[in-house]
């Protein structure tokens, strides 16, 4: 809704970038807090976090470029991250790869590390989707029950009971009532965050919280894709690539839970 906040020496600073940075910062402090509670080496956790973020950014950009190659015409387009254009699933995969490298290099326990990362990812993603709302990226399909096309957030008696209209200059089509998929996902991520914090307190085995995160987000994203207007469905199956990845995520999380629960030596965490 507010693509640009201020301009410093001609450089325009977007609310999107500020909120994404805030999400990373909040996630960083949450990871450190949980790492101390687990008795982990905080310096090793810090370094692993930085590697995961770097790989996550690279993965998010590469995945978006592969999904939307027609949007990129020059090197500047490829590097202009401040304009948006990242894929969360690409970032998640890249972040996991980076985290595995850090866990291996700094000799951290795998599943304890995964469990402290899961709530931080969900909370950071909440701020990220608020950023998407400000920029207008990741927008929804046209809302068919709209009664106004004035810029702003409008309430409705039809699900999801509100819709958004973006101004000119946003990534989303201007002055068009749309499903508020960014806000729907943002508050879905916030709910997942609180569920994970509760689960973290009472987790039955290491790796449970991370597995639960993959499952919950997989369900959330699969559902939301029906309302998103960004990624077209795959011909022949009617599902988007994000929905296919979501189904794989759900199935993988259930399998992971089963394997971790039934490991006889689960009282001892694993290193990679």
Curated annotation (Swiss-Prot):
Family assignment from sequence similarity: Belongs to the Lgt family.
What name has this protein been given in UniProt? Answer: Phosphatidylglycerol--prolipoprotein diacylglyceryl transferase
A GO biological process held by the record:
lipoprotein biosynthetic process
| Pathway(s) served | Protein modification; lipoprotein biosynthesis (diacylglyceryl transfer)
| Function of the molecule | Catalyzes the transfer of the diacylglyceryl group from phosphatidylglycerol to the sulfhydryl group of the N-terminal cysteine of a prolipoprotein, the first step in the formation of mature lipoproteins.
Gene that specifies this protein = lgt
Instruction: Recall the GO molecular function terms of this protein's record.
Output: phosphatidylglycerol-prolipoprotein diacylglyceryl transferase activity
Top EC class per UniProt? transferase
Q: Which InterPro entries match?
A: Lgt (IPR001640)
**Which EC numbers characterise this protein's activity in its record?**
2.5.1.145
Q: Supply the alphabetized keyword list.
A: Cell inner membrane, Cell membrane, Membrane, Transferase, Transmembrane, Transmembrane helix
């Amino acid at each position: 809704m507010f693509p640009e906040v201020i301009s410093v020496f001609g450089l325009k600073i977007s609310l999107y970038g500020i909120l994404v940075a805030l999400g990373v910062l909040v996630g960083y402090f949450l990871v450190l807090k949980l790492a101390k509670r687990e008795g982990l080496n905080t310096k090793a956790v810090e370094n692993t976090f930085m590697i995961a973020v770097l790989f996550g950014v690279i993965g998010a950009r590469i995945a978006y470029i592969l999904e939307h190659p027609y949007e990129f015409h020059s090197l500047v387009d490829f590097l202009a991250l401040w304009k948006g254009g990242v894929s969360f699933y690409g970032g998640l995969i890249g972040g996991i790869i980076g985290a595995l490298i850090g866990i291996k290099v700094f000799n951290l326990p795998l599943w304890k590390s995964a469990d402290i990362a899961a709530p931080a990812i969900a909370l950071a993603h909440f701020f990220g989707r608020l950023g998407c709302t400000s920029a207008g990226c990741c927008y929804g399909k046209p809302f068919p029950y709209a009664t106004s096309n004035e810029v702003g957030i409008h309430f409705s008696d039809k699900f999801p009971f509100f819709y958004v209209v973006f101004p000119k200059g946003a990534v989303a089509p201007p002055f068009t009532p749309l499903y508020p998929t960014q806000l729907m996902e943002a508050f879905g991520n916030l709910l997942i965050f609180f569920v994970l914090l509760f689960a973290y307190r009472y987790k039955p085995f290491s790796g449970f919280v991370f597995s639960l995160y993959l499952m919950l987000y997989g369900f959330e994203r699969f559902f939301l894709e029906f309302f998103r207007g960004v990624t077209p469905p795959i011909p022949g199956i009617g599902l988007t690539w994000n929905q296919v990845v979501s189904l794989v995520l759900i199935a993988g999380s259930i399998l992971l839970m089963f394997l971790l629960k039934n490991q006889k030596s689960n009282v001892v965490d694993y290193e990679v």
